[in-house]
């Protein structure tokens, strides 16, 4: 019985792991091979979001009711600072890219080709 309870506690994280993994363009002409720099791309890999000069661990995923979206506690560090934010992430149904919503900001990123990184 205890093993079953542990399995159910771990299962939601395993189901969501890798759901948004990929490399995404910051702009239409962004270089997909340059991750984390201005003019380059962003990456989500193994529940870590790599942005420009920063990275965030995507923790405590919660599926948003009646939406194909996930809410994360983002534990971020970069440029000699650390902070926490909440962010909602979902796949872009039109382009196959990513939509990321932070408090007051929404971003839409196109996915780079699979062989970009």
Question: Where do the PLM segments sit?
Answer:
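Short, solvent-exposed loop/hinge segments that bridge or flank secondary-structure elements
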Residues: 19-53, 82-86
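N-terminal helix-cap/turn-to-beta initiation motif at the start of protein domains
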Residues: 14-23, 44, 65, 113-115
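Short, exposed beta-strand-loop hairpins at the edges of beta-sheets
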Residues: 89-109
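Sec-dependent N-terminal signal peptides
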Residues: 3-14
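Contiguous, well-ordered beta-strand patches that form the walls/edges
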Residues: 30, 50-94
